Design a protein with these regions (language model features):
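Amphipathic alpha-helical interaction segments
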Residues: 42, 65, 69, 85-89, ...
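Hydrophobic/aromatic-rich alpha-helical bundle segments in the mid-to-C-terminal region
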Residues: 102, 106, 110, 124-175, ...
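Residues in soluble alpha-helical coiled-coils and helical-bundle/repeat scaffolds
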Residues: 38-42, 78-79, 95-99, 163
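Amphipathic alpha-helical segments used for helix-helix packing
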Residues: 47-48, 79-105
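Helix-turn-helix
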Residues: 4-42, 46
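Hydrophobic/aromatic residues within well-ordered alpha-helical segments
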Residues: 40, 47, 82, 108-112, ...
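Hydrophobic alpha-helical connector segments
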Residues: 55-84, 138
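Solvent-exposed, amphipathic alpha-helical segments
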Residues: 4-12, 66, 70-73, 86-93, ...
Length: 183
């Protein structure tokens, strides 16, 4: 059902997407959809959130290698036409609907911050980053790092239409890590 939702969204756009279209494409009754998702917004958010489940933070032995791997995974994900259509539609609709924006944050953004937390913890354990001194600052830094990486990659792919090349990734990581790396 989630695949059918993303396919229908890519084909029809937000305005054209209905629970009926998704049910027909998925081969289920509309009541089946409504039992699990009370609205189109909920269904689309879950469909988009499931795309990001495949992102993982590897432990490749260095923060640089870990970030390169995640940026590559994220760029590959964003290169898919269905992902582009789904994200752009969801973000556009979220600008008009504060509840949808909150749901996007809860179901998509906040769960993906786990990648930053995992990468930071591994880098701290390896001595690449200083240990956190207080929880509030650490949480704020996770937010800033996530926003910087996700925002930059999304903007480059979805807004500028530019590819994420290995050379671009290396330069981006140089700029990102320069002030962070311990001594």
């Amino acid at each position: 059902m989630l695949d059918a939702t993303r396919e229908a969204l890519a084909e029809l756009g937000w305005g054209g997407l209905t629970m009926g279209h998704v049910a027909s494409r998925a081969g289920v009754a509309k009541t089946t959809l409504y039992r699990r998702w009370p609205s189109k917004n909920e269904l689309v958010v879950d469909a988009v959130a499931s795309i990001f489940d495949e992102l993982v933070m590897p432990d490749l032995g260095s923060l640089r290698a870990d970030i390169e791997a995640v940026v590559g995974q994220f760029a590959d994900l964003l290169a898919r036409p269905e992902t582009q259509a789904a994200l752009l539609a969801l973000f556009a609709e979220g600008t008009r609907d504060p509840q949808l924006r909150r749901r996007i944050r809860e179901a998509i953004v906040d769960p993906q911050k786990r990648l930053v937390r995992q990468g930071r913890a591994a880098a701290q354990a390896r001595g690449e980053l200083e240990a956190d001194t207080d929880t509030a600052s650490a949480c704020e830094e996770v937010d800033i790092i996530f926003d910087t990486i996700a925002g930059t990659v999304e903007h480059r792919v979805l807004v500028s239409g530019e590819p994420i090349t290995p050379a671009w990734t290396r330069r981006f990581i140089d700029l990102l890590l320069g002030p962070l790396i311990v001594g």
